[in-house]
Amino acid sequence: MAGVNTSVVGLKPAAAVPQSASPAAAKRVQVAPAKDRRSALLGLAAVFAATAASAGSARASVFDEYLEKSKLNKELNDKKRAATSGANFARAYTVQFGSCKFPYNFTGCQDLAKQKKVPFITDDLEIECEGKEKFKCGSNVFWKW
C-alpha cells in the first residue's frame, strides 16, 4: 500500500472501543429546604395573580369597546345581511328571471350590477359599501363607481 499510512488503516471506530470499567463518581444533589420552596412558590403565585388581574381588566376594556362598536353597527349589519340574502337568491336566478341576459352578462352579473340596475344585486353592492371609503369596499377593489 503505497502512500497510505498503515497506522490509520487498522483503527476501530470509537463506538466499538470498550470504555474503562471505572465506577462513576457519585453525584450529590442538594434539595432546598421546604421553607424556601414554599416561599418561592408563594412568590410565584403572587406574580401570576397580579399579572392575571391587570390583564383581565385590560381585556375587559377592549371587550367593552368592541361591544359598544357592535351595538352601533347592528342596524347596518342587519340591513347588509338581508340584502346579501336577497342578492344570493337573485344571483341564482338572474338569467331565468331575465335580469341578467346574455350580451350584457358577458363579464358576469356582478359587473353588470355596477353598470346598471340589477334587482337585489345592485342594492347589495350599495349597502355593502355604505359607510366605507371609496376603494375600501370588498366588491369595489378594481372598480370605480
From Swiss-Prot:
The keyword Cell inner membrane does not apply. GO terms for biological process: photosynthesis. It is a peripheral membrane protein. Keywords: Chloroplast, Membrane, Photosynthesis, Photosystem I, Plastid, Thylakoid, Transit peptide. The keyword Chloroplast applies. Residues 1-60 form a transit peptide. One of its GO terms (cellular component) is chloroplast photosystem I. It is found in: Plastid, Chloroplast thylakoid membrane. Its main location: plastid. InterPro entries: PSAN, PSAN_sf. Belongs to the psaN family. May function in mediating the binding of the antenna complexes to the PSI reaction center and core antenna. This is Photosystem I reaction center subunit N, chloroplastic. It comes from Hordeum vulgare.
